[in-house]
């Protein structure tokens, strides 16, 4: 990854895809191998159900993305770039995660190459993020997103943890919790009003003169990007759709 050498990874990925196809042939020979694998993540979902939804999204999103790119109005987000000390980023993320309800006596937050949430039990839930010195918002919103997953995990049944009733219902339900917090809550005017003082206290040189409205516009800027987890609310679905079509 650090050397950007996909050629080293490609043979392993090829083998994995071949094994997933073989697995599907043994486990669910009555359906396509892709439908069998979809069912692992979203029970009952099939290409026949998903494709029309994605086609509908594409018909609306592609013109919208084009209109945004061609718009004369471009919100100022320059103050979101700078030099943000990593320990301050960590403290800010932890504070907001706690405010959301994540119980650190039943979980922890660490650093990883790619943000994720995991753990073996509702009393041991692990969330991770990654830090960039020049962009604190990437880490903060990763923390918020993964805390959404973590809250779902910490809310699962403690009794009968090995039984189906204690399992996460589906990937879609799980992702609905993380994206609800990240998009609906953390990109809202109310969130920006509530947390601008804390952000300004953490990074005064950048945010002392910034209004909540400016912050709200900056965290909602929409522009195409190569990285799914860094994508905005408008372009994010296109990352998912593109992967689906490639697969």
Predicted features along the sequence, with ranges:
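Contiguous, non-catalytic segments that form substrate-binding/exosite surfaces or channel walls
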Residues: 1-136
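Acidic/polar loop patches that form or flank catalytic/metal-binding clefts of enzymes
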Residues: 105-106, 159-163, 186-197
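Hydrophobic/aromatic-lined pockets within catalytic cores
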Residues: 42, 62, 66-69, 73, ...
């Amino acid at each position: 990854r650090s050397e950007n050498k996909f050629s080293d990874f490609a043979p392993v990925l090829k083998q994995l895809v071949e094994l997933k196809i073989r697995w599907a042939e043994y486990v669910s020979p009555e359906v396509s191998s892709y439908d069998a694998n979809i069912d692992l993540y979203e029970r009952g979902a099939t290409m026949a159900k998903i494709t029309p939804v994605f086609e509908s999204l594409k018909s609306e999103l592609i013109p919208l993305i084009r209109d945004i790119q061609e718009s004369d109005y471009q919100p100022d987000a320059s103050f979101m770039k700078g030099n943000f000390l990593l320990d301050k980023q960590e403290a800010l993320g932890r504070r907001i995660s706690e405010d959301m309800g994540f119980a650190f006596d039943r979980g922890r937050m660490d650093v990883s190459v790619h943000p994720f949430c995991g753990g073996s039990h509702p009393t041991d839930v692990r969330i991770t993020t990654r830090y960039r010195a020049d962009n604190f918002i990437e880490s903060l919103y990763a923390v918020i997103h993964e805390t959404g997953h973590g809250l779902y995990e910490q809310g699962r049944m403690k009794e009968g943890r090995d039984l189906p009733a204690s399992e996460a219902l589906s990937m879609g339900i799980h992702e609905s919790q993380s994206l609800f917090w990240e998009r609906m809550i953390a990109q809202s005017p109310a969130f920006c009003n509530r947390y601008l003082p804390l952000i300004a206290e953490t990074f005064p040189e950048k945010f002392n003169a910034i209004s909540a409205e400016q912050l709200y516009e900056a965290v909602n800027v929409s522009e195409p990007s190569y990285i799914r987890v860094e994508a905005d609310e408008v372009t994010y679905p296109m990352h998912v759709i593109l992967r689906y079509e490639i697969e």
